[in-house]
Amino acid sequence: DKDWYGTIPLGIIVTDKMIFTVCLEDTQVLTRFMEGRVRSFFTYMKTRFIFQILYRNASMYLRYLRIIDKKSEQVEEKLHLSTRNEELIELLELQKSLTYFITSLRSNEVVLEKLLKIDSIKKYPEDTDLLEDVITENKQAIEMANVYSGILNGTMDAFASIISNNMN
């Protein structure tokens, strides 16, 4: 089990005949597409394909945010029992992950809002609805990340004070 989660850029390049994705590592965002496990997935419907990738991306953020929340609760339980610096460091790593998530999600939000306003890209009838769903998922992920970050900051401050008091 990882104690932190990071983000990596994923580029999508669209030409007349192809769609390229560029990433420094293999990414789970694209795995389901490559395995043929995404319904209504057609590469010739370029805009929809891009929106499906973005939806999968937002969904994965939500999934990992829930994992981070559970992990922080587990670490907090351990802190209640031991009050060691080690658990505080684990919480710090989770907080760092949330900071990366928030930064990345906010960048995604700007791109998604621009995609909604651009008329020059071909959209199929359901594409606008799908893009709006992506925007909703992304906004939900931003809110969750902000809430979890606030809770984690408060928890770390409280336990740091407890540890400091115990040492005095």
Please report, for each region that a protein language model flagged, where it lies by residue.
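Membrane-associated alpha-helical segments
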Residues: 17, 57, 73-76, 80-168
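Extended alpha-helical interaction modules
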Residues: 1-89, 113
